[in-house]
Amino acid sequence: MVHRLPTGPGETGGVSDQGFLHAAGPTPVAAFPADAELPVDVVVYGPDIPDESSLRLLGPTEGKRILVLGAGRGHTAVALASQGAHVIVVDAHDDRLEAARDLADANEVKLELHHGDLAELAFVRADTIDAALSVHELGRLDDLDRVLRQVNRILRTGSALVCSLPHPASLMLDDSEPGPPRVVRPYADRAARAVGDDRIHPRTIAEVFSSFGRANFRVDTVLEPPVQHDEPSPFWTETMTLVPATLVVRGRKDGV
């Protein structure tokens, strides 16, 4: 069942699509997971990088209550449910929730699906979630701090939020034309970028780290995973060999 919650206020701010809307060729990494065919037995944090079986950021998940922020097409949630977790998914897009439900049905697992803004988590009691996970979704948020505060409220003390985001260095570059990638924006430029139907809000690593700290998370892991070359995904570009495409962060809820 999909539970409907009130959506949050609309996002504001300018949008630029410079360097991110490819007329043809690879899918922009910032659009991940888009319609990519992903496994349903392991969590994938981004295109062409090691997955949870290598990174081991979540720990044992069987019997755990895990919040997934952003449904994607359901692969992350189904992978966790297949491992025995009770998975709660929040997303503001009906089509993504329906895709997650269809994938769960096809794999004979259950998901608890909620429609609403990622910061509207009042339906979850405080200190009841064992882990939270977001794959390339928090980069689409204008107000990251608000979401992190709400996630911190519902996590048990010591429990982790693991998230992946488009790496800010990769968002500086445009590789849509032949030849070397071009730098099209400063590293610290916060202007939103249009990527397909989404908007990406670039943040430096320092800004992400500070947002976690303000929400009472202790960051214990920051990863810039190297790309893997064995089976390139639809997101693959040579630029991924020059700068990291995905940033992965884990923060644990500190005690009061």
Walk through the language-model features, giving the residues of each:
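Core SAM-dependent methyltransferase catalytic element
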Residues: 215-217, 234-256
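Short alpha-helix
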Residues: 198-222
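Conserved class I S-adenosyl-L-methionine
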Residues: 1-62, 75-79, 103-107, 160-191
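A short glycine-rich, Lys/Arg-flanked "PGG" loop and its adjoining helix->strand segment in the class I
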Residues: 145-160
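A short acidic, Gly/Pro-enriched loop at the edge of an enzyme's catalytic core
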Residues: 119-132
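A short SAM/SAH-binding and catalytic strip from SAM-dependent methyltransferases
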Residues: 130-145
